[in-house]
Structures are given as structure tokens and as C-alpha cells.
Amino acid sequence: MSKLRVAVLGAKGRIGSEAVRAVEAAEDMELVAALGRGDGLEALAESGAQVAVELTTPASVMDNLDYCLRHGIHAVVGTTGWTDERLARLNAWLDASPGTGVLIAPNFSIGAVLTMKFAQIAAPYFESVEVVELHHPNKVDAPSGTATRTAQLIAQARQKAGSAPAPDATATALDGARGANVDGVPVHAVRLRGLLAHQEVLLGAEGETLTVRHDSLHHSSFMPGILLGARRVVTTPGLTFGLEHFLDLN
């Protein structure tokens, strides 16, 4: 059986270097390119890569995906900063490259994806729900893509169930005191030295609370999801948003 030819973009970063090691250790994969800042994208096509694992920055991701899709290279994307406008551009590129797949995953940790699913299931059964994400102080975006996605899934579940808005009598507050509002769900971001990536979903009802928490303690926690994404994206054309779609959770 031939091995899946994988390239890593952002290979010199903390997660990227971990991804390089994970691909090299995978028996069914071959690392054909490991590109860092300043390396030319032409190496992707020259290497014969079937899949590119994109772990760069919001400033670079669109150019990288444009190149991949013009050359029929599938992509597994962990870079954040996705807006409706960017997703529309990406879908237009995919329309011009039928058969090519792109997975965008707000989080590659299997545990984090399960946390989102658990919160989505529980949300309609509680009056109140808020999300708290905690990360290292070098993280450039807030709230995290995982927290935003979690809040969106919670809001969808509550809307489908016909849940009433969460009670909140706050009349005055300092800017940001109640967090960011993501589809009606408060999301709070903490940046603290010593942390890596953590999230809590707090749910409350009369006489009880439920906390759903996940902690990533090392970048290695993201590798099983990255490898799963690389294996599945080659047979999943078009855009897939969220690793949960590759986990058969339904």
C-alpha cells in the first residue's frame, strides 16, 4: 500500500514541529515537505504532496490555501482567523477545484472536540451557559477558535430546542466584563503564563450546575486529530468545518 504524501506548513513552529514528528512516525504516511517562514510554496507541488497540514498564521493561510487548491493538494488547516468573507473566498476556490478537500479544525484535540459535543448536548437542558477559555499569553486571538465554535454549537442547540435566553439582570458593566457575545453565549478569555490550552463550559439551572472542562497539557494532544484529518480529507471533497465531522459522533 502506498503511503499518504504529507507536507507541513509552519513546520518550525511549536505545533508544526510536533506535526512533523507525528507524520514521520505514522506508518501510513510519508513526510515529503516541511516548510517554514521564507520557504517557497513551489516545494509543495515539486514534492508531490497529496495533503498539506497548514499551521501558519492568519496572514499567510489564504495564500497557502490558494496555492494548494490551484495544484489539487488537499489541506488540513489549524490556522485561526476565519471570517464569513474568507470562507466565501475559500468555497469559491474549492468550486474551481472539484475533488479537492479542505478541513478547517478550530481544535485538533479529540478531547476538545468531545467537550464541544458534550456541551452541545447539554445546553438545551440548562437555563444558563457560558464559556471560559484559558490560554498561554502568546496566543494572538481572543476568544479562541475553539471557544467561538463551542458557543456557536451551543447557540444552535438551544435555538433548535426553543430555549429561552439565559437570565442576566446586569444593568451596568465595564467594557468586556461580561465577555464577548457569540450568538447570545458569553465567552470569556483568560491569558496566563503557565497555561497551554484549556476550556470550561459552565451550565446552570435551578439547584444545580454542570461544568464540562478540557485541558491540553502538551502540543502532542493535537496530533491524533491532525493525522485523522489528513487521512480523511483526501476522500472528502469540499469544505469540512470541524473535526467532529470525521469522528462519526452522531
Curated annotation (Swiss-Prot):
The keyword Oxidoreductase applies. One of its GO terms (cellular component) is cytosol. The active site is at H135 (proton donor/acceptor), K139 (proton donor). It is an enzyme of class 1 (oxidoreductase). Its EC number is 1.17.1.8. It is found in: Cytoplasm. One of its GO terms (biological process) is lysine biosynthetic process via diaminopimelate. Gene3D superfamilies: Dihydrodipicolinate Reductase, domain 2, NAD(P)-binding Rossmann-like Domain. (S)-2,3,4,5-tetrahydrodipicolinate binds at H136, G145, T146. Keywords: Amino-acid biosynthesis, Cytoplasm, Diaminopimelate biosynthesis, Lysine biosynthesis, NAD, NADP, Oxidoreductase. NAD(+) binds at G10, A11, K12, G13, R14, I15, G78, T79, T80, A105, P106, N107, F108. Pathway: Amino-acid biosynthesis; L-lysine biosynthesis via DAP pathway; (S)-tetrahydrodipicolinate from L-aspartate: step 4/4. HAMAP family: DapB. Belongs to the DapB family. This is 4-hydroxy-tetrahydrodipicolinate reductase.
